[in-house]
Regions:
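Serine-dependent carboxylesterase/thioesterase catalytic core
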Residues: 97-103, 118, 123-235
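Flexible, membrane-associating and regulatory peripheral segments of lipid-active enzymes
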Residues: 6-97, 106-111, 115-126, 148-150, ...
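Short amphipathic alpha-helical segments
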Residues: 110-112, 171-173, 201-202, 252-254
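C-terminal catalytic-base region of ester-bond hydrolases, centering on the histidine
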Residues: 19-23, 233-319
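Sec-dependent N-terminal signal peptides
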Residues: 1-3
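Residues that form or flank phosphate/diphosphate-binding pockets in enzymes
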Residues: 108, 135, 287
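Short catalytic/ligand-binding loop motif for oxyanion handling, primarily in non-cytosolic enzymes
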Residues: 106, 196-198, 247-250
Length: 319
């Protein structure tokens, strides 16, 4: 769609007026496309040092998501450090919460939840963007580790993940040095495929879909048995929010049992969870759901979701 709009302009179409609805839409499309291409390497408030995975293309984004510097890794790291030393990029101190999106999404998909968290928590709420189609879960976990390492003055760090974002956090936890892990406070998992994904297993049986899988999607579709062994169970307090109807059937006719249209309730299970909550919401709508938003705040503050929490499923799904 973005390409079509640009081609139309190049062939004499009426230019898009700045600030118009069309310009706003084009900007959203551009940011969505870039979210599939660039991964954060350092995040300080809304300043970002980013890399295009698999290349030596680096850049710095300011709080308006405008690109202020491009170049190789050394040049961009040096400029980011200069901006920090000059006080343009302030340090993150005290409590921090890092929010992660899911597969094929970008930071914008988490904004409804992020906005709510920022209005309610006495913490710096950051978003971690990663190019899910361009790199595997190992690479995304390593990138998250560099983001955490870039926050040395954050005394406690909590995580909120949606879908694949939870697996990225768990992969980082498997790799993380002890000093970083000691700063981890709590984690909220939203629609997490902790036991893999039946939808991914279905895709693996269709050779065309399997062949088209790239990056983190390939890990879910083809490499799950291996990947699952490299994901840590969080040592911190963590709670799980699952979407479902509570009727044993769920939103999808393709999936067995209750589900959120993408992830089965049973697939969200992970031993050691401090609390579990079933919410009547689809996978893609979790971030906008007021019950999910309030439960997330409650867990980050108290270690419990509050209200009536459903019992966790007794067993993970069959492989």
């Amino acid at each position: 769609l973005l390409a079509a709009a640009l081609v139309a302009q190049a062939h004499g179409a009426e230019p898009v007026a700045p600030g118009s609805a069309a310009a706003t839409w084009l900007e959203k499309v551009r940011l969505a496309a870039e979210g599939l291409e660039w991964s954060d390497d350092a995040v300080k408030h809304e300043w970002r040092l980013q890399q295009r995975p698999g290349s030596d293309a680096w850049r710095i984004l300011d709080p308006a998501d405008a690109c202020v510097t491009t170049g190789d890794e050394a040049a961009c790291r040096a400029e980011f450090a200069r901006l920090e030393a000059a006080g343009q990029i302030p340090p993150v101190t005290g409590d921090a919460v890092i929010v992660l999106h899911g597969l094929g999404e970008n930071r914008a998909s988490m904004q409804p939840l992020v906005k709510h968290l920022r209005s309610r928590l006495d913490a710096t709420v950051l978003t971690f963007g990663y190019a899910s189609p361009r790199a595997n879960i190992d690479d995304h976990g390593a990138a998250l580790g560099r983001v955490v390492a870039s926050l040395p003055q954050a005394t406690r760090i909590s995580f909120v993940g949606h879908s694949l974002g939870n697996l990225v956090v768990r992969r980082w936890m498997h790799l993380a040095p002890a000093p970083d892990l000691t700063r981890v406070h709590r984690m909220v998992m939203l629609g997490a495929p902790n036991q893999g994904s039946d939808l991914a297993r279905m895709a693996a049986r269709v050779w065309v879909l399997a062949a088209l899988s790239h990056g983190a999607a390939k890990d879910l579709v083809l490499n799950w048995p291996e990947i699952s062994r490299s994901l840590a169970v969080p040592a911190c307090e963590f709670g799980i929010v699952a979407g479902g109807k509570g009727d044993g059937r769920g939103y999808s006719t393709l999936l067995e049992g209750d589900d959120d249209a993408v992830v089965r309730v049973a697939e969200t299970k992970l031993d050691g969870a401090r609390d579990f909550l079933l919410v009547p919401v689809s996978h893609a709508a979790m971030m906008k759901n007021s019950s999910v938003q309030e439960a997330t705040v409650s867990f980050l503050e108290t270690g419990r979701f509050g209200g009536a929490a459903a019992p966790a499923p007794d067993a993970p799904p069959d492989e």
